[in-house]
């Protein structure tokens, strides 16, 4: 629903059985944007059939890339963007079924390479 000033008064989208409502900043509804230049402490994670397409659409819509799409050791392909309001969004798709044993081994290798 458009706001009188041309902004977004109300928008919603459905992810599985979860409905998410968003709007532009509006003091009368206690909807405040974060101070410019900051990033929210939360991360919205969206499972999708096509991580790369979701990432590309977000970038074209004005999001900033924080991590380009890449395969992760736990079997997902994921990317992270920051929207113009400072919120981070992760797009993920399952690309490989990883056994618990392989996951433990890969996690050990991943975290040992970070020290």
Label every model-predicted segment:
Residues 1-49, 53-82, 92-115:
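Vicinal oxygen chelate
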Residues 85:
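C-terminal catalytic core of tyrosine-transesterase DNA break-rejoin enzymes
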